Amino acid sequence: MSPAHGNRLGTPESPNATTLLLLGSGELGKEVVLAAQRLGIETVAVDRYEHAPAMQVAHRDYIIDMTDATALREVVQQEDPTIIIPEIEAIATDELKRLETQGYDVVPTAQATRLTMDREWIREFAAEEVGVTTNEYAFADNYDTYRKAVEDIGIPVVVKPTMSSSGKGQSIVRESAEINGAWETARAGSRSDTGRVIIEELVEFDSEFTLLTVRHADGTTFCPPVGHTQQDGDYRTSWQPHSLTTEQRTTAQQMAQKVTDGLGGYGIFGVEFFVQDGTVIFSELSPRPHDTGLVTLSSQRLSQFDLHLRAILGLPIPDIDVERPGASAALVVDEPLTRPAFTGVDEALSMSDVDIRLFGKPEAYPGRRMGAAVATAIDIETAQERASEAVDCIHVSDDKT
C-alpha cells in the first residue's frame, strides 16, 4: 500500500483521474465517496443491489455479486482504479489478494480485509498473539462442540457467526432453553459456508466504546473515544467524547495500536472495547469507518471519513479534537417498506444544532437503519437528547402515491 497518492491528484472523468473503487455502497460508503469527491477523486461504487446509497453520489456504479471472484476481477480490470476500498465483509478476499500482488492498492491491505472479516482470527490474534485483554471465548463448527463450549463458559453467553456483520446471526443465551435457538440463529446468519460460531462470555459491562484509530504514513493518531449503545449487536446511538480515565484511555490506545500494527496498511480502524469494573476489554475491530463514528460528522472538524481518505492518500493528519460534544441516533424501521418515504424531517431540523442524514436505501426491512440524526451541544447529555428527539420526529412509511 502506497501512501503517496496525495502527491498528485488528477481530475475526475479525465485520463489522469485518481480513481477510488468502493466495494460495498451503504451509508458509510456514501460518506467515503462524498469525502473523496471533495478532494477531486473519481469514484466508482459497487454493490449487490441497484440504487445503493453510495451509488447515488458516485461517478459510476456496478451491480455484481462481490463474492464472485470473476465478476470482481472484471470490474477492477475495466476500471483500473488507483485505490480499492472494501467497505463490507462479503467480498472475494482471495481475489483481492491476487489483485494486490498485481499492483493494486487495497485498503488497508487485502490480508487485513480477509482476516478481520473472521471473528475467529481477529479474536485469537488479539488475545493470543498480541496479548490484549478479552472476555472468555470458544469456537464450534458442530452442535456437540457448541453445547460443550456453552457449558464450559457458563450461561449467559453471546453466540455469533464467525463471519457476519451488523449484528446478523447474533443472540444472547440467558437460559438453557435458548441454547438450540441461538445455534440455529448463528448458523443462519453466517456469511461463510463453514457455519462456525463464536461463543463468548457475556460481559455485563459498565460501558462500551469505539476508538477510531488512524494509521498513516507518520504513525498512529487516535480520535477521542466514541461511546455507543447497541441493540441486537447493531449500533443505535453514539456520542463523543466518551468519558474514560487517563489510564483507561491509555490502555485502549495501546491495545488498538498493537492490533492495528499487526494488520498494517493505512486508513481508519474502528476498534471496539468494553469497560467492566474499570477494566478495558477488547471486543472487535473493523478496518474501515465505523457506524458508531457517524457522530464525527458533527463533533470533529474532520470526520472519520475525511481522516480515512487523508490517511489512504498520504495527506497530513492533524491532532484530532472534539470541536463540541456530539451525539448521533440511528433511524431504524420496524417493518418492510418497498418505497420508503420520510415525514417529520422539517420538525427534526427545526431543533438547534441538529443535522439529518437520510441514507437513501431503496427499500427497508425490520431493523434496517434508514438514516441518522447528529447533534452538538454544550454537553453530551444535551446532544444525546437532541439527536434522539430529532429521530423521534421522523416517520418512515410506504409511499403509496
Curated annotation (Swiss-Prot):
One of its GO terms (cellular component) is cytosol. PANTHER family: FORMATE-DEPENDENT PHOSPHORIBOSYLGLYCINAMIDE FORMYLTRANSFERASE (PTHR43055:SF1). It comes from the Archaea. It is an enzyme of class 6 (ligase). Mg(2+) binds at residues 272, 284. Residues 124-313 form the ATP-grasp domain. Gene3D superfamilies: 3.40.50.20, ATP-grasp fold, A domain, ATP-grasp fold, B domain. Transmembrane segments: none annotated. Involved in the de novo purine biosynthesis. Catalyzes the transfer of formate to 5-phospho-ribosyl-glycinamide (GAR), producing 5-phospho-ribosyl-N-formylglycinamide (FGAR). Formate is provided by PurU via hydrolysis of 10-formyl-tetrahydrofolate. GO terms for biological process: 'de novo' IMP biosynthetic process. Belongs to the PurK/PurT family. Homodimer. This is Formate-dependent phosphoribosylglycinamide formyltransferase. N(1)-(5-phospho-beta-D-ribosyl)glycinamide binds at residues 27-28, 87, 291, 361, 368-369. Its EC number is 6.3.1.21. It holds the Pfam family ATP-grasp. ATP binds at residues 119, 160, 165-170, 200-203, 208. Pathway: Purine metabolism; IMP biosynthesis via de novo pathway; N(2)-formyl-N(1)-(5-phospho-D-ribosyl)glycinamide from N(1)-(5-phospho-D-ribosyl)glycinamide (formate route): step 1/1. NCBIfam families: PRK09288.1 (NF006766), purT (TIGR01142). The lineage of its organism: Archaea, Methanobacteriati, Methanobacteriota, Stenosarchaea group, Halobacteria. The keyword Metal-binding applies. InterPro entries: ATP-grasp (IPR011761), ATP-grasp_carboxylate-amine (IPR003135), ATP_grasp_subdomain_1 (IPR013815), PreATP-grasp_dom_sf (IPR016185), PurT (IPR005862), PurT/PurK_preATP-grasp (IPR054350), PurT_C (IPR048740), Rudment_hybrid_motif (IPR011054). One of its GO terms (molecular function) is ATP binding. Keywords: ATP-binding, Ligase, Magnesium, Metal-binding, Nucleotide-binding, Purine biosynthesis. The gene is purT. It catalyses: N(1)-(5-phospho-beta-D-ribosyl)glycinamide + formate + ATP = N(2)-formyl-N(1)-(5-phospho-beta-D-ribosyl)glycinamide + ADP + phosphate + H(+).
